[in-house]
Amino acid sequence: MDMWKFFDITHREHILCNPMSLEKLDQLITLLRLKHGARVLEIATGKGEFIIRLAERYRQMTGTGIDFSPYCIAEVRKKHQTRVPDAQLSFLEMDGAEYLPETLESFDLAACIGASWIYGGHRGTLNALYRMATPESWIVVGEPYWRHEPEGEYLEAIGVTRSDFGTHYQNVEVGREHGLEAVYTLVSSQDDWDKYEGLQWYAAETWASDHQNDPDVETVLKRVRENKTAYLRWGRETLGW
């Protein structure tokens, strides 16, 4: 089935499409202290809660949000018009990896939160954002990390390899390779993770009940239930973010 349809179904109850609380997001936004007229780029903007909240707090910023999902782009454009209609924001439906700004090193904040697969991993993401950000800018990323060594069965179940993610410390060290220094980190709590995962189960089951004739019902339920088993059996104790 269409991957964006699947993502839209399983995240229809989410405000944030990652395992982070709104309180932590607001804390981050407060710490950024964007200057007047700051230029912001968010790759994989999702439902756009981060960039919309930035615009609500920093009214004089301009922002560009990129996402490949037509569902997400439609939702974030609606948020823009209802919550910050006067904000200078634009949203592009495209592959983030193909986005190139008119001028490199032009953004005061460059972000890709929870979608490093776009650039082939954490290192590739930092490299891409680094090239688009000004020397004194903020770079914001969200990346999984191993809390302890993952079991082989878990890796097979979720379709990743051990080398796809590092430890929390290793994620920071990759930044240092680019001359970046981590000044703050937000780590998802068990409650953050349980809410993120649990809302997917709820969304899938309620959607399936309401759309019993949809040809993708079986696919959605099978995938979500398999992911639920992997999370409860291994992921809850193994994967951080």
Set out the residue ranges of the language-model regions.
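A short SAM/SAH-binding and catalytic strip from SAM-dependent methyltransferases
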Residues: L109-G121
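Conserved class I S-adenosyl-L-methionine
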Residues: G37-G46
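Conserved alpha-helix/loop element of class I SAM-dependent methyltransferases that forms part
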Residues: N18-H36
